[in-house]
Amino acid sequence: MQCPYCQHTNSRVLESRSSEGGQSIRRRRECLCCKHRFTTYERIEFVPITVIKHDGKKESFDPSKLLRGMVRACEKTGISYQKLETIVDDIEAQLQQRTQREVTSQEIGQLVLKYLRQENEVAYIRFASVYGRFQGIKDFVDTLKQLQEEDLVPSETIWKPANDDFSEQETPSTVMMPS
């Protein structure tokens, strides 16, 4: 490791520990030439995830953009900002574990809805109304009816917007359409 003070390439590791919840390694080093001490971090380099939007455009996955959308949906619901950050981190981890580097915005929306459904029904409805591009009150009523039915029959069911075009591959195995 190159010393930031004298640019010498030899250093010794004084201390090494896990950091950032096991996501990186923090190393305390000492330059063998100038004796200055410095800290380095070793992190996993993730391959970027590309999001395919509704209109077909592609953009890099931005966790902060997802978090902002969730914060808006969860205002005044009692879900803490830290909980939303944890959900976004979980979603990002799930996406990183996939072999495919492209994901549709619909798939991301489904993941968010799955988490919000467990946390708060109001947040779920708010997010679904934007994600599903609700056109009117009928869309809200249909989604509320679906929530009531799911409460009677517990399942892993996820709401699917009526105007969405999932291919067979992309459709979660237990998707319900609003009636």
Swiss-Prot record:
GO BP term (any one): negative regulation of DNA-templated transcription
One Pfam family in the UniProt entry: Zn_ribbon_NrdR
Keywords on record: ATP-binding, DNA-binding, Metal-binding, Nucleotide-binding, Repressor, Transcription, Transcription regulation, Zinc, Zinc-finger
Cofactor binding comment, as recorded: Binds 1 zinc ion.
One function term, GO molecular function aspect: zinc ion binding
Cofactors: Zn(2+)
Name of this protein: Transcriptional repressor NrdR
Organism name: Rippkaea orientalis (strain PCC 8801 / RF-1) (Cyanothece sp. (strain PCC 8801))
Gene: nrdR
